[in-house]
């Protein structure tokens, strides 16, 4: 089958047609890749080799498609079902930059009728990362409820990116008023996702804190840094400005590489979506248990339209080779819209 191969860390992506089609194992499904999205993690893995389990490797982790074969023990899916989600990163057979890929049954989403195949490809990695940060890390209950003027705030740093937009949506869905940070040019993206207010992340930290204080009046105890660059702002906001009567204040971040100094009364959580589908460590087992437990509710909210796909830009025509164009375009992409590629018509 065709795919986009990477021979080594620091190498170039190239199109091949000699890949072996994967075979689903127990509790796995084989999916025909119809649309795949481009994420920052592909460039990270290409440059560093991290998260890659074997070379050469096909990358890509975010896609939508059609089930063409089910492995032993699968009960959720049947051949012909439309599915999407985030696959196991850096693992042969599971990558989405190829014609067919594997998914673990309990980590895959059923596509709602009201979501297009292109839209579905924008959801998996961003929504799951946001859910790990907001629901698991910041301990927000995954339950649909209306907010009021008395509701506490959830602060989302880096709210205009794909993870940030889903974090904003989750916060609003779960009854929080949401304050998001972004560049001023992306304020409308943040508000369209559901944020009640936004502020400029380019301000110096003290000015960001003053803005947070003015908007929230200290009625918050949870901050999620979707940008991986907001640790100082988030922690200082919680220590200096947050509701001091809260027994615990929560800071979660997508920065999973820089240690965070423990502070009294502050719970911290570093999101590691790179562990999706992996096994062998207590951490990986817990992360996958968390993801699997959230997917049914997330599916329900997507079906009801309470969570929405991201806006997207489709790159190129139809075909696996178009992924090369999208990877190149991603290097200069700043619009806040997801880049997607259609590999096949159906």
List where the protein language model places each region:
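Terminal helix/beta-alpha structural elements that buttress the NAD(P)+-binding lobe
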Residues: 1-25, 32-64, 69-70, 75-346
